[in-house]
Amino acid sequence: MFFAVLLYGSESAESVSVFGIAFTDKNDIIDFGKADPKAPTKIFLQDALSLSLYQQNGKKRIGTEEMNEIKNTKSDFEQKIDNLKQMLQSSRRVVFLGGAGVSTESGISDFRSENGIFKAIQQFGYPPEELLSHTFFVRKPDVFFRYYKTLLLTTDAKPNAAHAALAKLEAQGKLTAVVTQNIDGLHQLAGSKNVYELHGSIHRNHCMRCNRFFNAEYVKNHSGIPYCPCGGMIKPDVVLYEESLDPDVLAGAVAHISRADMLIVGGTSLQVYPAAGLINYYSGNKLVLINKTSTPYDNYANLVINDSIGKVLSAAVE
């Protein structure tokens, strides 16, 4: 699927409008829908990194030679942590974009991993992509909920060092937003306030008939398919395959990433779209990738650390 988004960008001493969302100089969103018609720029989520809103407005990106110098001279873990600390100290608008690797350190399995796929097929007879599709939910809700409750509805998981470090960074006034692909709500449990959940949350559930709200415990404790007292089936507020992302959540994520002077991407291989394409909206020169394995964007990053996201962030955030 290919997503196109229209952004409007303008700057003044008092406010900035990105994606039709007005910001003050302190990064507070002051108005949704104030688009500046004088500076339209059409950008696609899967465009090359060089196509960014700020580049279109004449702001210069860091050169390849400078990027390589930062990466190549920081060879060991301690040096890279020092470099990450310096980046954080010089930044005012940090955004974190996270994936499944953040949650796996809390004991939550990654259903897209080789082990996760094997478990799904072995236990339920279908791959995760089919089990978690809208079509499967409608046609075989009994199997869907058996899989969902067994492997995704993890209400007993606790925040880890990465969640704690990000909440601390937000409390310090450095971090403006967490953009996550995870549905477990652990960022909020750790204390983060401004969280954009791209794929929804297990903690929000609604009756498909009357729209009544139910928490995760109700769904978990309900035997078989969860039903509302009105008789309607309850659907978790998680984005299934074949479903679109919430446009308001996507807009907020894009706006914050576009305004960021530092983007930390952690616990993701950057291969799941459209979430991975959000990195293309960043136009600064402090792109940090923290993942145990390499990603397609490593050559674009100013700093790459192949290690545990919790270990790295807890060492860097003081």
Predicted regions and their residues:
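Conserved catalytic core of sirtuin-type NAD+-dependent deacylases
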Residues: 42-44, 54, 58-318
